[in-house]
């Protein structure tokens, strides 16, 4: 899984590298798809959910813009503009093992500090959750840490952040979506134990308004009901006997976990 995670880490960097005003979300998709293919991996998003005549999800990434939270479909006609908030979610399979990761970025300069703070709060919540993950902990500890971080950021920033429920993280390994579901709200000491060998995708989604969502007519794109902008952050992690390792971060999560005093377990 670490090998798949490193491929995806490089792909996400490539996708971020082409984000600019005047670029289509399909161009971001294609940049990520090229890195995945060059590594001998395949996308686990493309044709996800296919059944019979239904081809499933039509792209390598989810490209969600502004009020789109998750599962946005890339398009050659969806042209990014300065100030847009783009969430890139992608995954790959290498040698039968899956990886899944997401990042939110602004196109050019952010239109306001509240949007800068939104992305920072979402990323911090992800890292707070990951920092609690270790052998003999419980899933509720991780979920509570995400929720608590969002609430703390809201107080610190003087803003309302909506923590999206109903969408969240998941187990990952020989399939992209496996048990358990990883909610972004929870209670400490509750839920299944985190045991060595377990792999999870940790992915908070927060909004600048209320957390209520709706799905668009394409059957995929999830947006905020109130039209507020949203951010999404995600890494795939592994629980080991000695702690946690971030599979989809080139540094195994060292930079993100440092502020929590956590040193990730190297798997390279």
Residue ranges: model-predicted function:
Residues 2-268:
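Active-site neighborhoods and metal-handling regions in enzymes and metal-associated proteins
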């Amino acid at each position: 899984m670490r090998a798949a995670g490193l491929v995806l880490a490089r792909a996400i960097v490539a996708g971020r590298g082409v984000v600019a005003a005047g670029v289509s979300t399909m161009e971001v998709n294609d940049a990520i798809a090229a890195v995945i293919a060059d590594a001998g991996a395949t996308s686990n998003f493309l044709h996800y959910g296919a059944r019979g005549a239904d081809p499933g999800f039509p792209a390598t990434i989810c490209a969600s813009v502004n009020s789109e939270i998750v599962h946005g479909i890339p398009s050659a006609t969806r042209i990014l503009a300065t100030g847009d908030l783009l969430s890139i979610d992608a995954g790959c399979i290498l040698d039968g093992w899956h990886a899944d990761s997401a990042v939110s970025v602004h196109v050019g300069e952010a239109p306001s500090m509240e949007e800068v703070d939104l992305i920072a709060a979402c990323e911090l919540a992800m890292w707070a959750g990951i920092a609690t993950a270790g052998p003999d902990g419980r899933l509720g500890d991780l979920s509570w840490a995400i929720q608590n971080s969002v609430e703390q950021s809201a107080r610190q920033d003087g803003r309302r952040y909506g923590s999206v429920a109903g969408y969240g993280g998941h187990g990952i390994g020989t399939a992209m979506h496996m048990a358990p579901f990883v909610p972004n709200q929870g209670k400490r000491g509750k839920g299944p134990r985190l045991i060595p060998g377990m792999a999870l995708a940790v992915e908070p989604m927060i909004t600048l308004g209320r957390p209520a969502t709706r799905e668009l007519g394409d059957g995929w794109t999830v947006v905020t009901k109130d039209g507020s902008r949203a951010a999404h952050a995600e890494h795939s992690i592994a629980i080991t006997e000695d702690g946690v390792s971030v599979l989809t971060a080139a540094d195994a999560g060292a930079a993100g976990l440092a502020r929590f005093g956590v040193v990730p377990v190297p798997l390279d």
